[in-house]
Amino acid sequence: MTLFLDKLDDAFLDTVDELRTLSASDDVQVALKRIKERYGLKHIAYLAHSLPGRSHKDPLIVVTYSTDWVKRYFDLHYMRNDPVVARGLWSLMPFDWSEVDLSGVQVRRLFGEAREYGVGRHGMSFPIRGQYGDQALFSITSDETDTEWSRIRRLFMRDFQVLAYHVHQLVLRAETAEVSPVKLSPREVDCLRWAGLGKTAAEIAQILGIGTRTTRFYLETARYKLGAINVTNAVAKAISLNIISISV
């Protein structure tokens, strides 16, 4: 393989150090390319199904695949039938693509064309779950032989369970940097902060010396301003935007 196994530890540590220094949206694509080259992979794909401040209908997708394959994949709506994406949205554990059911006609067509377009002979995916509902899937592919893949995939499983989350953190930093500032009142900030610490509306009201209905009003207006679907989501967005900090 391109990467000698005795260099894996160096590759891992160097990659972690680099990812921690990046924060711009353009850095995500650059980071994936560097990881691909450093680990001797065929391709890398990152799909964020849910991010603070971003609608489920507007997923973030960053890949190293060819432009032709990406265009075909979306033109033919292959994501709807992609068993890797489907499993990645409910699974908590990493999985090898060989574990995915490929019995369906549409699925066999998808994977057949993927190989033709150079996606890679083997693949592995790493589901990502954030503290406040953010959800993503990080995938790697390889063109190694079956024998070589069975030898190295355990090492990749070890490294990429961590690297996937570092890439996700980079995405969160990049997304935060591009979001327009949201202005919350001091009371809205206070209520959100205490909600983030697990307090109920009644408990927050007692802490702040205001009515429970007033507390709920502040939480609702904060949720609306942040474009959140609920208070938990509002807390996540407020943290990502550095509006609040959850510490006692």
Task: Walk through the language-model features, giving the residues of each.
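Basic, Lys/Arg-enriched C-terminal extension of HTH/homeodomain DNA-binding domains
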Residues: 224-248
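Helix-to-coil/beta transition segments that act as allosteric "coupling" elements at the rims
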Residues: 108-133
